[in-house]
């Protein structure tokens, strides 16, 4: 899987598994094969991880591989091939956010090779099970397992502020700009409220948009947060919003629920599997800024 220092959902998922009973009950090892650095460092990191994998492979019965977009899947083909040569059982855990860039793209052959050599392929939702099966006809090999999250945080009480929180990379797919535009429609009605963005990406574009819409004083961009800073901002927030256009199964929504936050999001990826609109979250169509403003 990715490095512990890598930002994103896969790292969050594996860290959550590290805290689970299975990590203590079985002999588990996390081999890091990817990191958010420049090209040469990424290559060195991959080679180091692969050598480590080959070294420990004889001592293990099962190889659990996490993958997503085509570059990740292509790298993991090497691991699967050697695992099967050594007659190991293989699980491939698929975390992608769009079938159009993966199983329904020109890179479909990569996933065909990877998934057909696995003993089991895990996807994050019923929707993704349908996508993958329609593309590759894996049938009984496919299994849905939802992402895990901790429930310990729910036992704590937090002092709240008037904050609407967004956590994730700031890019078009995540819909951060829609959140700025929607909040601009209601900001004057709620002058003591802030929208706070916790994530890297298009921060400067976000600042310019909020200034253009006249809400720059009610908008904060924290950059990427983790550890204490992440804990602090989730505890202080009153509402969580993720206006995504495409997702696998967003860990950020699970994190928000773990902190007891009401969630506003879109019915994409694995969200429809767990969504009960008006009960455990509020939904709106991706890109519907007026509807998002109404939900806020």
Where are these regions (language model features)?
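Short hydrophobic beta-strand element within catalytic cores of glycosyltransferases
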Residues: 262-265
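Conserved acidic donor-binding segment of nucleotide-sugar-dependent glycosyltransferases
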Residues: 277-278, 282-289
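Glycosyltransferase donor-sugar binding loop
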Residues: 32-35, 167, 194-207, 223
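Nucleotide-activated donor-binding/catalytic signature segment of Leloir-type glycosyltransferases, i.e.
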Residues: 207-225
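Donor nucleotide-sugar binding/catalytic pocket of nucleotide-sugar-dependent glycosyltransferases
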Residues: 116-154
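Short alpha-helical donor nucleotide-sugar binding micro-motif in glycosyltransferases
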Residues: 224-225, 232-237
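Aromatic "clamp/platform" in nucleotide-sugar-dependent glycosyltransferases that forms part
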Residues: 245
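Conserved donor-binding/catalytic core segment of Leloir-type glycosyltransferases
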Residues: 149, 157-187, 195-198
């Amino acid at each position: 899987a990715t490095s512990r220092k890598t930002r994103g959902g896969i790292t969050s998922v594996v860290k959550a598994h590290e805290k689970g009973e299975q990590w203590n009950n079985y002999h588990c090892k996390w081999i890091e094969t990817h990191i958010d650095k420049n090209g040469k460092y990424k290559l060195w990191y991959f080679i180091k991880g692969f050598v480590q994998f080959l070294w420990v492979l004889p001592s293990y019965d099962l190889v659990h591989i996490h993958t997503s977009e085509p570059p990740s899947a292509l790298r993991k083909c090497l691991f699967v091939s050697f695992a099967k040569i050594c007659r190991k059982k293989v699980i491939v855990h698929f975390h992608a956010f769009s079938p159009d860039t993966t199983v329904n793209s020109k890179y479909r052959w990569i996933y065909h090779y990877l998934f057909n050599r696995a003993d089991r392929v895990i996807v994050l939702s019923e929707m993704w099970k349908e996508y993958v099966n329609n593309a590759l006809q894996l049938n009984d090999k496919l299994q849905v397992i939802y992402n895990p999250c901790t429930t310990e945080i729910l036992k704590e009480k937090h002092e709240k502020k008037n904050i609407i929180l967004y956590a994730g990379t700031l890019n078009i797919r995540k819909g951060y700009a829609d959140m700025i535009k929607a909040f601009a429609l209601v900001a004057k009605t709620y002058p003591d409220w802030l929208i706070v963005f916790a994530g890297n990406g298009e921060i400067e574009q976000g600042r310019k948009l909020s200034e253009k819409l006249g809400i720059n004083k009610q908008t904060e961009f924290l950059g990427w947060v983790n550890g204490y800073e992440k804990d602090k901002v989730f505890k202080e927030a009153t509402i969580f919003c993720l206006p995504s256009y495409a997702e696998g199964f967003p860990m950020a929504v699970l994190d928000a629920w773990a902190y007891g936050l009401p969630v506003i999001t879109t019915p994409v990826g694995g969200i429809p599997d767990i969504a009960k609109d008006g009960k455990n979250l509020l939904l709106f169509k991706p890109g519907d800024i007026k509807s998002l403003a109404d939900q806020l």
